[in-house]
Amino acid sequence: MRESTVSVVVPTLNRPAMLLRALDSIASQTCPPYEVIVVVDGPGDETFRAVRQAHPSVRLLQLKTRSGSAVARNHGVQNARGSWIAFLDDDDEWLPRKLELQLSAALRSSFRYPIVFSRLIVKTPRGEFLMPRRGPGRQESVDEYLYCRKSLRPGEVFFYTSNLLVPRELFNTVEFRPGQKKWNDVDWLLRAGQVPGTGLEFLPQTLSVWNTEDFNRPTITGDYDWQYLFQWATSNRQLFSPRAYSGVLLVSIMHEAVKQRDRRATHVLLHEALHRGEPDTIQAVLFIVGILALFGAPRGAYQWLKLRLRTHLPADT
């Protein structure tokens, strides 16, 4: 019989007000965790004072120097005493039944190492959205779930660290990778998915809130660009099926290149996808949409193409 103790790990960086909001959401859980561990990434006297006053039962750990989210999470896990690990970033929140429902699903799972996640609310300056639109199929691998789209609609798949419940034992094999500038959660998930007995368990309930209103605040992760992500993908090609590999190149990394307005990405990504991947129709279409955005297609033509493509390609399943 599986144990049911949960350790919550919260990495933080110089934003005590947001951290207290996150800790309040943990304190409101219908299934209280065994312990809450806050890992302060570098100097943080103000954070220590705020947490000790508002949540005195929280375990406070501190890294001597700023080391990034991967090191902070790993340090928290290494000091955890629970049999399950849940992560919460300091600027995010949980809804009250998050731990209750995810732990119940984990204990029922047939996988040796179930990775449990659910829908979440994404709060942006443009409004609120629910993601992901679909969970993984029972036999769908991690890489193909993330990068082999079944529709053109945004938000079809989504994975986020604050929305996870993971067996503590799995971290004995796969930790977060220090030095990973971005996609640290996805990098971990892809590597964890290679461990025999690992599987994704998806809950359709909405259980977490990802707050993205303030893009100028300091973050633990740091900056990045599409070239960094391209190097990451090519260095870790063994983690992808050929179709998933073309998906990460033509859709996900191309999306970052569009945000940077860097046209050089077009040839680089297409060449790699054609030579080492297996692009499907939806990936090709989304890549073309990215090209139109990069090279300045008239907005009317751009929107017309997106509408026509949505009409003639599969909807969500």
Where are these regions (language model features)?
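Catalytic core of nucleotide-sugar-dependent glycosyltransferases
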Residues: 205-214, 218-249, 263-276
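Short aromatic/hydrophobic "clamp" motif used to bind/position activated sugar donors
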Residues: 85
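Membrane-interface aromatic/basic loop that binds lipid-linked glycans or pyrophosphate carriers
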Residues: 28, 44, 258-317
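A conserved acidic beta->alpha catalytic loop
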Residues: 25, 32, 40-49, 65, ...
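Flexible acidic/His/Gly-enriched loops in nucleotide-sugar-dependent glycosyltransferase catalytic domains
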Residues: 71, 99-170
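Conserved nucleotide-sugar donor-binding catalytic segment
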Residues: 139-225
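N-proximal low-complexity "stem/linker" segments adjacent to membrane-targeting elements
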Residues: 1-27
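Glycine-rich, basic loop-to-helix element that forms the pyrophosphate-binding segment
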Residues: 63-80
